[in-house]
Amino acid sequence: VAQVNARVPEREVQRRLELVKAAYREVAEKGFAEVTLDDIARRASVSKGVTLYYFSSKEDLLRRLFAWLVDSIHERMREAVSSTSGPAEKVRALVAITFPSPSKNRAFFRAFVDFCGLAARRDGFREVLERFYRGCREIDREIVRDGVRRGDFRVRDEEAAASTMRAIFDGLMMQWLAESDLETSFSTYRERCELELLRYLVAGSDRRRGSDPATKPGAAAVESGAG
């Protein structure tokens, strides 16, 4: 009996995860407004009643989905940067997991844009979005600090640099989503993201109008790595 009872929470955790993943696929395909609990239940091969047993409402389920995505992203980011040593390599590792493939990026950012819209209107989603960016900036800041300590990066403000890194990631990703040919343009945006991040970090606040990043220390490594 004890063994059976011990397995119940495990089964419930697994069922919740299955429903969350089903919700992600539905939102990525249809958008938040069009997705229903019936759609999610059908995707997970359960009844709507089962879905409501685990989540009180569609909004509750999608907020949990958003939180799950945030946790997953932070985990992948940490794994990526821990597998490399140099600051520039860590930046490249972040770009690689941020731009994995056209299909994965399209699915994720369609869902993410919906969640950002919800965060502007609903506190529960806003809190999750704040946690997302706080965690990303923390990881980015550690990379910046390491790069500055080694003399590879010349930014003066670690907090501002981490925020700017996020702006480059998000800005280029949003522009890519607006392209008519996502497949063909994908590699261009991924390469540009890597190049702009490293150029910014190497030049940092010391960069002046008309200055050439190639003249900065460490720029040769940036250019060779980006190519």
Show where each model-derived region lies.
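Hydrophobic/aromatic-rich alpha-helical bundle segments in the mid-to-C-terminal region
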Residues: 124-130, 134, 148-197, 204-217, ...
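Short coil/turn segments at alpha/beta junctions that flank glycine-rich nucleotide-binding fingerprints
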Residues: 29-33, 84, 105, 150
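Hydrophobic/aromatic residues within well-ordered alpha-helical segments
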Residues: 15, 58, 65, 69, ...
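Amphipathic alpha-helical segments used for helix-helix packing
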Residues: 90, 103-127
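Helix-turn-helix
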Residues: 18, 22-60, 64
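Amphipathic alpha-helical linker/stalk segments
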Residues: 3-7, 21, 29, 65-94
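Hydrophobic alpha-helical connector segments
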Residues: 64, 78-108, 159-165, 190, ...
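Amphipathic alpha-helical interface segments
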Residues: 22, 26, 97, 168-175
